[in-house]
Amino acid sequence: MEKLEGYSEKPKSRQQYFVYPLLFQEYIYAFAHDYGLNGSEPVEIFGCNNKKFSSLLVKRLIIRMYQQNFWINSVNHPNQDRLLDHSNYFYSDFYSQILSEGFAIVVEIPFSLGELFCPEEKQIPKFQNLQSIHSIFPFLEDKFLHLHYLSHIEIPYPIHLEILVQLLEYRIQDVPSLHLLRFFLNYYSNWNSLITSMKSIFLLKKENKRLFRFLYNSYVSEYEFFLLFLRKQSSCLRLTSSGTFLERIHFSRKMEHLGVMYPGFFRKTIWFFMDPLMHYVRYQGKAILASKGTLLLKKKWKSYLVNFSQYFFSFWIQPQRICLNQLTNSCFDFLGYLSSVPINTLLVRNQMLENSFLIDTRMKKFDTTVPAIPLIGSLSKAQFCTGSGHPISKPVWTDLSDSDILDRFGRICRNLFHYHSGSSKKRTLYRLKYILRLSCARTLARKHKSTVRTFMQRLGSVFLEEFFTEEEQVFSLMFTKTTHFSFHGSHSERIWYLDIIRINDLVNPLILN
């Protein structure tokens, strides 16, 4: 435990002290209102078209924030429209939101500087298109075929928002900025409860996305920081366990002797003393730990996670939230795909002179499929089909032009195929394509007050070309015109596109739920 505390003290040498004065710079709030730093998503704040911030206004806002009556008034009168009440100009939620967005940008600066001045030997080598979501799947294809056990972890939210402030003290030692952060968090927790409910966290997530993302990423980075420490300690344990024996050669000879007496004993016992490499992948508030070790090793890691979360983050992870599964017998939902590693049996008949024999070959394969029912449910919520998958028209779009309707339906279809291009089986995708194509035809037929058959005959191939996906164009280049190839077959070629940096809108609600 002393080593762990010393390990957590190391980053304090890179702490930044002068963050608070940046809150009085006007360009900070121009970033908050516009596109932010590094081209991030714009902050959507209502009613800020004709408003301008100055350093004097920011100073007055901060002074008012330190008066408790402002926050108590906000809690006792939550339904009061302070945005339109010009007498309560400084009390408005609008300006507190602007200030919190500016604060979120300011506190991001020390972390950006820490990445710039990182030693060269510790820098991660830059890899093109590493930000792509699809770049994770080739890694899983390469590694998961050689692993045995898989653990699913739901990263919990902090019980108290004060924990987030304490975690930032490792990186920022600017006391006024930390006090200001406490005022923001106490505002969202309503000053009432000692234990912050999930409602307060979701309120912060909804009203101030940038500040919530920064706090959550800081929290998760500390979580992974200590997880890395445990991983390094497990590697040292492997070397220590080997060094406890006086002579490794005699130990190996002894194990070989036991292996002769008890077939299979040598390999299993050696793995008991080794701590294999642990693979870690985080996504959407969840994490995956995969290893080649034994079930005993996975239980040891489970105990590690429960204990260090209770000690450093002051919350109790329920052991049942960490699921231990054998990789070959489990199927896990990962970024809109149902992934699994099944074992395929292949019988090979060999003929040697007059003797013939069968060889039973078992091969692992990383399989990714598209879940049909959840995606049909997403299309149903978007009013493209019924709950059972029957296509219907979309009356909201009947006021648009024909080209706009075709473009919208075709773009949705292409985006679905583009995101799920790594699926092993395309049958579900072609079912979704059929739903969108027929829904588009019904919408156009409803607009022109005609039947679907008549409208399809009038458009012909122009209507079909709108739903010709990018993946089908790639496959059309792979086969000559003389070769008969059906795009509606069950081909299993997978394509991972490295330009996808966000989850498809129809897939994202499925993951969040």
Swiss-Prot record:
Role this protein plays: Usually encoded in the trnK tRNA gene intron. Probably assists in splicing its own and other chloroplast group II introns.
HAMAP family in UniProt: MatK (MF_01390)
Subcellular location(s) of the protein: Plastid, Chloroplast
Gene Ontology MF terms in the entry: RNA binding
Organism: Arundo donax
A biological process term (GO) from this entry: tRNA processing
Main location: plastid
Similarity section: Belongs to the intron maturase 2 family. MatK subfamily.
Entry GO CC: chloroplast
Matching InterPro entries: Domain_X (IPR024937), Maturase_MatK (IPR002866), Maturase_MatK_N (IPR024942)
Keywords: Chloroplast, mRNA processing, Plastid, RNA-binding, tRNA processing
Name under which the protein is recorded: Maturase K
